[in-house]
Every structure is written in structure tokens, then in C-alpha cells.
């Protein structure tokens, strides 16, 4: 059921047909956010499967709200188009690139970097539950980890829906490590058969990476096509816990 808060924000609650919600917002609503008091993992999973980015906010007191976002303009690209700079290639020899080994650490590092403004505790709890149960979900939450030895230098949290991967939040701790992590992520997604890399809100660095901007209707069309296609999970070589980042960038994997 769709209702309105005092400021004209749509209020949504599970069960909700999230594809129909996305269509309604596209046709009738010029802004980007809905709101809900529900952080149920099933609901967050359904929102991700419809192309929303799950965010959260607080009213300054005890009230916590899920604020699903469906951007009016979205930054997207095909992973094969990721720009790999000379600097990224040179620095990549220092690092390994892994997946799903340190989800909790990556999430904590994102909060330490960006604060709790939208990464509210109930949202993080939902993400942790969705990661723990990812094999039983429509969408698969994941962490990407760029490490120098055991040191976690950069990483991100994202979610797979079919052959679409959406980057949700990330961090870096060393100069240049974020550039290497994004380049390695692009190469990993390409090798895994991901057709659409959704980078969310347009920012300058995403354009440098190779992304372009699309309207909300264009995004939903691209997202739904990719969602219905399968992507493979590329695993590290036998006996290894991660990929050499340089090998990913050089397309040796």
C-alpha cells in the first residue's frame, strides 16, 4: 500500500510489488526517495531486485527509517568499458583482490569513512543478514576486498541481481588503492559475465572510470534486462583465496 508522509514522500511497507512501485514512481513522482519503517531483509531484498538502492536515515531521536532511492539520473556502464590507468596498473602489483571474505570489515570501514548519516544501524543489520543468507535470496550481497598482504586497503559493498551488479558504498585507506579496486572490480565483473554495472548517483570519478548517465526509465529498462540474465561467479585459482590484482587488470584471468 502506498501512502504519503506530511512532506509528500511516498510511504511503502511490505508486502509491496517493488517493480510496480518503480513504475509508479517513474510515471508519477519527480523525486527519488520513498520511506518505510520496515527494515525486513525480505523487503530490502525485493527493493534491490527492483533497482532501488537501500539507504536509511534517522529523525534525530529514536526513529529509524528505510529510504529506498530510485535515482532520476543513474550512472551505469558495461564492465568491459572500465578505464584502467597506467597508475592503476602499476600500483596493482601490490594488491590481491578478493570477494566475500571480509564483508563485516568492509562494512565497518565504509561506516568509519562515511559516517552513519545513511548507513544506519538497522540498515547494516539487514545487509549483514542478506549477506549471510545470500544463497537463498533474489539478490546476492557481496563485498569486494583489495588487500596488501593481510591489510585491507580498499573495498566496497554491492549487490548482484542476475547479470547486474550495483555498487552501494566503498572506502579506501591508501593513496591510489581506490582506483585499483574499482579497476579490478570492473575486470572481475567482466570476467564473471556481468552485463550492467550500476554505480548509482553520478559523480565525476565515475565518468572517468567509463560510466555514462541514463534517465530513470532508461535505467529500469537496462536493469530489468540484466536482472533476467545469469552471471557466473568467477572463483580464484585453485588453492588461492584471492586474485592477483595485476592479473585481473591485464585480463590474464
Task: Report the location of each language-model feature.
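N-acyltransferase acceptor-side catalytic subdomain
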Residues: 1-253
Amino acid at each position: 500500500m502506498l501512502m504519503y508522509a506530511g512532506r509528500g514522500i511516498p510511504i511503502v511497507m511490505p508486502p509491496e510489488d517493488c517493480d510496480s512501485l518503480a513504475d509508479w514512481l517513474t510515471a508519477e513522482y519527480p523525486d527519488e526517495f520513498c520511506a518505510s519503517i520496515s527494515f525486513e531483509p525480505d523487503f530490502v531484498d525485493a527493493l534491490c531486485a527492483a533497482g532501488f538502492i537501500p539507504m536509511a536515515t534517522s529523525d534525530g531521536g529514536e526513529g529509524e527509517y528505510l529510504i529506498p532511492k530510485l535515482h532520476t539520473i543513474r550512472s551505469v556502464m558495461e564492465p568491459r568499458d572500465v578505464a584502467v590507468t597506467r597508475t592503476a596498473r602499476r600500483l596493482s602489483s601490490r594488491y590481491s583482490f578478493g570477494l566475500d571474505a571480509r564483508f563485516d570489515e568492509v562494512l565497518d570501514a565504509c561506516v568509519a569513512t562515511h559516517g552513519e548519516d545513511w548507513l544506519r544501524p538497522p540498515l547494516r543489520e539487514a545487509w549483514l543478514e542478506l549477506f549471510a543468507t545470500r544463497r537463498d535470496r533474489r539478490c546476492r550481497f557481496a563485498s569486494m576486498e583489495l588487500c596488501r598482504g593481510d591489510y585491507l586497503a580498499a573495498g566496497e559493498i554491492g549487490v548482484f541481481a542476475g547479470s547486474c551488479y550495483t555498487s552501494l558504498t566503498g572506502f579506501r585507506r591508501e593513496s591510489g588503492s581506490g582506483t585499483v579496486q574499482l579497476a579490478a572490480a570492473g575486470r572481475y565483473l567482466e570476467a564473471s559475465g556481468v552485463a550492467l554495472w550500476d554505480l548509482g548517483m553520478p559523480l565525476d570519478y565515475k565518468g572517468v572510470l567509463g560510466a555514462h548517465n541514463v534517465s530513470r526509465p532508461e535505467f529500469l529498462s537496462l536493469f530489468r534486462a540484466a536482472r533476467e540474465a545469469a552471471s557466473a561467479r568467477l572463483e580464484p585459482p585453485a588453492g588461492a583465496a584471492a586474485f592477483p590484482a595485476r592479473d585481473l587488470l591485464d585480463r590474464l584471468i
